[in-house]
Amino acid sequence: MRKFNSHSIPIRLNLLFSIVILLFMTIIGRLLYMQVLNKDFYEKKLASASQTKITSSSARGEIYDASGKPLVENTLKQVVSFTRSNKMTATDLKETAKKLLTYVSISSPNLTERQLADYYLADPEIYKKIVEALPSEKRLDSDGNRLSESELYNNAVDSVQTSQLNYTEDEKKEIYLFSQLNAVGNFATGTIATDPLNDSQVAVIASISKEMPGISISTSWDRKVLETSLSSIVGSVSSEKAGLPAEEAEAYLKKGYSLNDRVGTSYLEKQYEETLQGKRSVKEIHLDKYGNMESVDTIEEGSKGNNIKLTIDLAFQDSVDALLKSYFNSELENGGAKYSEGVYAVALNPKTGAVLSMSGIKHDLKTGELTPDSLGTVTNVFVPGSVVKAATISSGWENGVLSGNQTLTDQSIVFQGSAPINSWYTQAYGSFPITAVQALEYSSNTYMVQTALGLMGQTYQPNMFVGTSNLESAMEKLRSTFGEYGLGTATGIDLPDESTGFVPKEYSFANYITNAFGQFDNYTPMQLAQYVATIANNGVRVAPRIVEGIYGNNDKGGLGDLIQQLQPTEMNKVNISDSDMSILHQGFYQVAHGTSGLTTGRAFSNGALVSISGKTGTAESYVADGQQATNTNAVAYAPSDNPQIAVAVVFPHNTNLTNGVGPSIARDIINLYQKYHPMN
């Protein structure tokens, strides 16, 4: 028999005690680390587990014209707000809605059948009975397991009969409130729509808000776009119910927005969203040890967003609108504008790109109604006509087809198997030599056709056969130069969704040739204004800019001090020499001041208060009954030797072929500007 060794017991006990002591020391060391050495870290973790932060948007900044006149306004109002905890059940929300209805008014609740069903199923007993009555395939999956709660709920909603949703008008008002409360996410705050609150209602709700968990009084705002000639470019703002646009929600959320935040959805409101958006208020929700909402504290006050001031003086803008309307009515009276969509004009500062006016009069061809349409200057496209001929000559210089003020023979152009292409005076004057300056002054089509042929690597010969192997590359060269002036490309204006023109990918040789004198590609009035502004600015293309600067708020919430002056954005410089640009300047000057019987634009200078340089343009078209019409266009800048304003005018489908009103309108716009803002 084996002997028991009693001496080993103390050794084992000592080992066991040593292990226990070591474990205790480890625990004590860990506690020391947590409670002494890293106390702040764990206190923050404990606090974060018992509190959460929510943000709420503040009123947007406002938009003003160049003189400080408001184009939009915010109306502040007191509203009911609701902050939801994660412990609130549908039953709790029903009770809150019922209490709240005794203190607010609801005029005409607009409810969907789904909202009625949600309220009906908010009763736990009813919901239980509805689910139990569902057929097995609506409760269980193919393996016999209970469906997820969301699937069960949707099936329960589908099974509710319309006959079960008969409610009184007062009950519908309660349901209307319940639906809004139920739409607020956990630890989020939403505004509850009611009739406008009076002072008494605000005081009562504020005093008893503890009886309705999550309910409080807060300040909200309504956005109103004032009725002005610039209303269409202001844009719109989403409602709190709509919140973030679905297609942009992810990007906004990354910037710290909430799903129900109101944001700009179009034009200036969208372009300057982050400037106009108010600073969010931050609230901290404190939870008790059971996870119930204990208190809500404001830790960061919100503030109204910054304001923007435009480059456009509303008084000048309105005067241009009135001028356009007067000219259009005159053309209506003589029958010339019956089929015209309206008349548009843009004025820019050629050096800074500041938009001085963007005016449009839209003509409803069915009703005959005339309405302001400033937005049409960046969204509507038109055939430009001869105003683009300076760009064609520039392409000739850029590609080595023309040299300086080169002389070509102005003659009838006849290609094999095609009808003649003439200038407006060819039949009366026949063939004669003509320079680039004269080609602009007289508005020669045939000078442009010969330049376009040169881009194809060919020289004009009467009745010649034209090979088209270089057609595509020639059109690319021509359009590339046009793009340097802003034609057929983005202007860089500070508005979203501007049209870049209509520049067809499919075209024929005939399309290419007529494009050289402005009879194919279509451009917006803003693009034409940038084109002439680029010429006035010695070939430097500057992005049009509607906003002059960003401003803070004064003590009353109105336009405050300047925060940031927006600077001009140079897009590019046209790739021609200074001497060649001087030829364009000479040509534009001669258009308005030439003494030849072929000078095309003396209307620019007749009655002008300052020296004007410009270019006329007519684009041939036909209207509904086959009657011939023209787009009567014009571009101009002034003063000729120190340009401070550049203007483009488009008057489409005018059947009064002998009345070229474009130059007269451009002249009168410049005269108006001289009266409002005298130029040196």
Swiss-Prot record:
The chain crosses the membrane at residues 9-29. It is a single-pass membrane protein. It comes from the Bacteria. Signal peptide: none annotated. One of its GO terms (biological process) is regulation of cell shape. Disruption phenotype: Essential, it cannot be deleted. Cells depleted of PBP2b continue to grow more slowly than wild-type until at least 12 hours after expression stops. Cells form very long chains and have an altered shape, becoming lentil-like rather than ellipsoid. Cells are more sensitive to amidase and have an altered stem peptide composition. It is found in: Cell membrane. Keywords: Antibiotic resistance, Cell membrane, Cell shape, Cell wall biogenesis/degradation, Membrane, Peptidoglycan synthesis, Transmembrane, Transmembrane helix. Residues 1-8 are cytoplasmic. GO terms for cellular component: plasma membrane. Belongs to the transpeptidase family. Interacts with MreC in the elongasome. Comparison of drug-sensitive and drug-resistant protein structures shows the active site is highly flexible. A transpeptidase that forms peptide cross-links between adjacent glycan strands in cell wall peptidoglycan (PG). Part of the elongasome machinery that synthesizes peripheral PG. Structures 2WAD and 2WAE are from strain 5204, a clinical, drug-resistant strain with 58 mutations in compared to strain R6. This is Penicillin-binding protein 2B. It comes from Streptococcus pneumoniae (strain ATCC BAA-255 / R6). The lineage of its organism: Bacteria, Bacillati, Bacillota, Bacilli, Lactobacillales.
